[in-house]
């Protein structure tokens, strides 16, 4: 699975794992949207932590899906970002490595952010 949720003391730790850079492809976007909806519906969950598997938080868009039908399927990254911003549970982005482009946008949508030493954040589009 591209997205897994682990419960730890009332916190939903949502890990997205789409090697090599945790690209935000359709499976990851769907998994994140579903995990956020489930956390918001569960009164026992007090907060959500978003983190990437491996060395990257997220490298942004999944270039393997460029110019394919999957790229335009819902939910869009904008939809996922809106879900993070409007979550009734506090969301913390645990930036475990590099966060680029849409990956940084996802982290910025969270209510809180923490980063490991040596992690990089940047917008290559700028």
Per-segment meaning from a language model:
Residues 23, 67-71, 95-98, 126:
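Alpha-helix capping and helix-loop boundary segments enriched in small/acidic/polar residues
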Residues 9-10, 55, 119:
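Beta-strand-connecting loop/turn residues
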Residues 52-83, 99:
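Glycine- (often His-adjacent) and acidic-residue-rich active-site loop
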Residues 1-51, 67-68, 79-82:
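Conserved CoA-thioester-binding segment of acyl-CoA-metabolizing enzymes
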